[in-house]
A protein has these predicted regions:
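Conserved beta-loop-beta element that borders a ligand/cofactor-binding pocket
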Residues: 29, 69-96
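Active-site YXXXK catalytic motif of short-chain dehydrogenase/reductase
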Residues: 62-70
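Glycine/proline-rich active-site loop of Rossmann-fold NAD(P)-dependent oxidoreductases
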Residues: 79-82, 94-110, 143-154
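Conserved C-terminal active-site "lid" loop/helix of NAD(P)H-dependent oxidoreductases
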Residues: 168, 184-204
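Mid/C-terminal beta-alpha module of Rossmann-like enzyme folds, strongest
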Residues: 128, 138-187, 215-219, 223-233
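Conserved sequence/active-site signature of Rossmann-fold short-chain dehydrogenase/reductase
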Residues: 33-34, 92-94, 137
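Substrate-positioning beta->alpha
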Residues: 105, 122-143
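Conserved Rossmann-fold NAD(P)-dependent oxidoreductase catalytic core, especially the SDR/UDP-sugar
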Residues: 1-62, 85
Length: 233
């Protein structure tokens, strides 16, 4: 009920495109499709896949959906001679298109921090998260589409940072923000990626301090001031 509607939706679009002679396809997935068990020190897009059955057992159904969708799309593209590129993002920062997007992460908890309220966490998680700026992500999509030699999976993130480093950077931007309680144990190492394929697309991506600052400043500009936050458009 959760997985197949997304998979079938993707395949229906690819099937319709194939009927019209479309040979170049780019789809958006997630880094959650590249989490092998057991974990590896440095992940890459070629060798490392999540186990969708393991994801379902862990009730990570959205992540499992991405894994199944990618495998089905790759099979369909091969059978129909389509050049398929798959971009794998995680946390997407920067300007959004619609007011309703402000209700999702990370914008909703950044808005809370700007307002002096509690953000996403009461306590800093001993974990890391991967991030990219939406404009850079769009550039990766265009680069993959326009380069006739590109195909396969590409990470769509700048890098991964531990949450304590993310909050420390945000405090530089928002000195009076409400900080979550600190971790009391040694921090785990952030996820590490092999970005050689991503970099082959030739897109220069904003670093994490820059994308955090630009996102906060954009939210502070009240971009949807004529429309109340929360209204769906």
């Amino acid at each position: 009920e959760i997985i197949m509607p997304t998979v079938n939706g993707c395949l229906n679009i690819m099937r319709s495109a194939a009927k019209q002679g479309v040979k170049n396809v780019v789809i958006c997935s997630s880094t959650s499709s590249s989490n092998p068990v057991p974990q590896v020190q440095i992940k890459n897009e070629i060798d490392h896949w999540s186990d969708e059955n393991e994801q379902c057992r862990a009730k990570k159904y959205t992540s499992a959906t991405k894994t199944v969708m990618e495998k089905a799309a790759i099979k369909f593209a091969a059978e129909n001679e389509q050049r398929l590129s798959i971009i794998l993002p995680t946390g997407m920062y920067g300007p959004v298109c619609l007011p309703g997007h402000m209700n999702g992460n990370p914008h909703i908890w950044l808005q809370s921090l700007i307002n002096g309220e509690e953000g996403r966490h009461k306590k800093v998680p001993n974990d890391s998260t991967s991030m990219s700026h939406l404009h850079d992500l769009a550039a990766l999509f265009l680069a993959a589409y326009e380069n006739p030699k590109s195909s396969g999976r590409y990470y769509g993130v700048y890098d991964s940072w531990h949450w304590q480093d993310i909050y420390a950077e945000l405090q530089k931007i928002l000195p009076n923000m409400k900080m979550p309680d600190p971790i009391t144990e040694p921090p785990v190492a952030p996820t590490r990626f092999d970005f050689s394929r991503r970099d082959s697309l030739g897109v220069v991506m904003r670093d994490i301090p820059t994308l955090l600052r630009q996102t906060v400043e954009w939210i502070q500009s009240d971009p949807f001031k004529s429309i109340k936050y929360g209204q769906q458009v």
